[in-house]
């Protein structure tokens, strides 16, 4: 992986610096998302890896730190898609769709995360997660989760009575070889 910084000397790969080489991601990173976990305008980078532990990078005084273990999100799975937004906590939560394993829904509690996917019925452990996005499907002022599965059932999860309910239409739900999901609003 590369982390490019546009410094006064031009573009620099921060992972090429000796101080950062020990935290270089050597597994297959499939998806990334920027996360302001503390709500202070400083972003970290969540890297969903395939066959290796999840990474969560933050830059501190010129050094890249991998905080995934400290944040208890360093799980090994078939990471395929990841999104972040105000899903449940009022802060930036993270949803990760995975292949050959359970999905993760990380609830943000003061900058630390707790996986609550099973509690909210969106772990979808027998599907192979692919494209995922957040959207206010029902136009009610909150983010819902739209996720697709490779040759599996696609989901449109909306929060109802403290659980997510899959409201995918039969047409959308049909298993296909899907990779990406996008949302477009028309008013």
Regions found by a protein language model. Give the residues of each.
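Beta-propeller blade repeat segments, especially FG-GAP/WD-type strand-to-loop junctions
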Residues: 1-15, 53-67, 102-116, 153-167
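Acidic/hydrophobic-patterned starts of short beta strands in beta-sheet-rich repeat architectures
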Residues: 39-48, 89-97, 140-148
């Amino acid at each position: 992986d590369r982390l490019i910084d546009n410094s006064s000397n031009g573009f620099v790969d921060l992972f090429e610096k000796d101080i950062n080489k020990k935290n270089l991601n050597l597994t297959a990173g499939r998806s990334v998302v920027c996360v302001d976990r503390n709500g202070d305008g400083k972003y970290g980078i969540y890297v969903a890896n395939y066959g290796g532990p999840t990474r969560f990078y933050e830059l501190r005084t010129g050094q890249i730190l991998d905080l995934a273990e400290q944040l208890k999100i360093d799980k090994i799975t078939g990471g395929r898609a990841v999104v972040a937004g105000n899903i449940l906590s009022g802060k930036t939560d993270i949803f990760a769709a995975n292949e050959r394993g359970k999905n993760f829904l990380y609830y943000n509690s003061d900058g630390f995360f707790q996986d609550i996917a099973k509690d909210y019925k969106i772990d979808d452990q027998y599907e192979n997660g692919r494209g995922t996005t957040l959207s206010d499907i029902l136009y009610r002022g909150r983010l819902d989760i739209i996720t697709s599965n490779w040759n599996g059932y696609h989901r449109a999860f909306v929060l109802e009575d403290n659980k997510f309910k899959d409201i995918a239409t039969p047409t959308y739900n049909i298993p296909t070889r899907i990779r990406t999901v996008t949302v477009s609003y028309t008013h």
